[in-house]
Amino acid sequence: MNLFNSHLLSYMVPKNLNLNWNFGFILGILLVLQIISGLMLSFFYVPAKGMAFESTLAVMLNICFGWFVRLYHSFGVSFYFFFMFLHIMKGMWYSSNHLPWSWYSGVVIFVLSIATAFVGYVLPDGQMSFWGATVIGGLLKFFGKANVLIFGGQTVGPETLERFFSIHVILPVIILLVVIFHLYVLHRDGSSNPLAVIDMLAIFRFHPVVLFSDIRFIVIVILLIGVQSGYGFISIFQADPDNSILSDPLNTPAHIIPEWYLLLFYATLKVFPTKVAGLLAMAGMLELLVLLVESRYFKQTVSAMNYHRVWTTSSVPLVPVLFMLGSIGKMVVHVDLIAIGTCVVLSVVLFIYKLLDSARVRA
């Protein structure tokens, strides 16, 4: 009870927190709800070739409210990543990278969430997810025995679903532990705020004002997920229709399109001529997030309002550039697209490098 009280009730926060500081609470609740809904689905899922697709279909048709739980779990991960991207952008804009351990643990949560979402995407054994796993399996072949350990063989086969199901169960538990560490270091070092000014007279308890604000926001988000599950009003969150077809190893889709939150990395793989180059570029984009932490050594005063012009001109164009990169991931590969995609990837690297460089000159 003392731990609950110190971190959720009596925890002191700045008075000037705005809507951007609700994203972390939303992500925590969505993660717990994903674990609960995933646990419910695991009671009926059979990780075997042929049976995986049939068991998923049986949940949709034969289990009371099974369709809602399955669709909630499917769309919940889209909302989870949507708010995670907003949370990362908030951290970049308001210099949260100057809280190093919070940023490091956040990057670990992001990477583990991507891995969890990918293996979960493969589990229904649909046509699109099967060939998506085949593409990733081809990228990891040079890891040798590690690839066999993860996929159960050199290619995607019956053992792959069993391995992926185990990974999909274990990784959320690890993420939850990292989230607890993330909260610990955040509350130990203190929350950031829009002005980045620590004034002991301008703080108050997390409960009730901020807590009720977070609860109100998460209720709205859960209602949106419910409406999305019933009506599918956000088309980009919908899965590809080919994933509603049982996987066929002898029939390759005309174009492989992963879930929208994986498009950034898939586009990075597409625009490079070799698998190794694409994989290194994808790892490099994640490494840039880590390098943002090291920019804290370049200046002692953290300021979000008195920012240098270079910081604004680097962070604002980064958003449409990332949208362009994601759009390229949905397109069919051709020579012109590769040229455009290469320019977009270089632009992402350039803008983040400018963020690093501008940290030296921000006031």
UniProtKB/Swiss-Prot annotation:
Binding site for a ubiquinone: H187
Keyword annotations: Electron transport, Heme, Iron, Membrane, Metal-binding, Mitochondrion, Mitochondrion inner membrane, Respiratory chain, Transmembrane, Transmembrane helix, Transport, Ubiquinone
Gene Ontology terms: biological process: mitochondrial electron transport, ubiquinol to cytochrome c
Cofactors demanded by this protein: heme b
Keyword Electron transport: yes
UniProt-listed SUPFAM superfamilies: a domain/subunit of cytochrome bc1 complex (Ubiquinol-cytochrome c reductase), Transmembrane di-heme cytochromes
Residue sites binding heme b b562 per the record: H73, H168
Recorded GO CC terms: mitochondrial inner membrane
Places the protein is found: Mitochondrion inner membrane
Amino acids binding heme b b566: H87, H182
Residues passing through the membrane, by range: 23-43, 67-89, 102-122, 164-184, 210-230, 271-291, 310-330, 332-352
Keyword Mitochondrion (UniProt): yes
Function: Component of the ubiquinol-cytochrome c reductase complex (complex III or cytochrome b-c1 complex) that is part of the mitochondrial respiratory chain. The b-c1 complex mediates electron transfer from ubiquinol to cytochrome c. Contributes to the generation of a proton gradient across the mitochondrial membrane that is then used for ATP synthesis.
Family statement drawn from the similarity comment of this UniProt entry: Belongs to the cytochrome b family.
Subunit structure: The main subunits of complex b-c1 are: cytochrome b, cytochrome c1 and the Rieske protein.
Protein name: Cytochrome b
Source organism of this protein record: Theileria annulata
